[in-house]
Curated annotation (Swiss-Prot):
Transmembrane segments: none annotated. This is Dynein light chain Tctex-type 5-A. GO terms for biological process: microtubule-based movement. Belongs to the dynein light chain Tctex-type family.
Amino acid sequence: MSDIAKDKAARLLKKRGSIISLGSHDVKPRGSFSKTKDSVSTVSYIDEPGHHDEIQSPAILMENTYQIGPAKRFPVASVNNILKDVLTSYLQEEKYEAELCRQMTKTISEVIKARVKDLMIPRYKIIVLIYIGQLNDQSMRVGSRCIWDPANDTFSSYSFKNSSLFALANVYGVYYE
């Protein structure tokens, strides 16, 4: 098998499969003999821009608009309503099952992204992150770091919980100059 075919197969496998990282096996400091429970995190889907197998279409050149700020602001309240509606309708009666929740994160993120795009907010890039986990009296911290313009870029967040699972949805609206 040629190197090109191996690279293509590896990219397809990476794109379609799951990536599992064992957090406690990555780096262990010398002299640490304490027993720790292994932490496992799973990423079920990664879309890497620029590594698509299709033939790339030529870039479309657009003229400068010289518009520095958005004509329409990112509607945080409307996006919060979308997050609440989608998470409640999809997860209200669900019980936590790992494989089901893995599929639901993909579905919910696509639905939320489509509904936010239906608001037709010009010149904003939309990023949707969904976290679903089992509810077991644990705590969790989720953080994100971005370099952005606080005057134009913003986010919306909503958390949901029922008797067996929790979900957190974040939508980032980043102004595209």
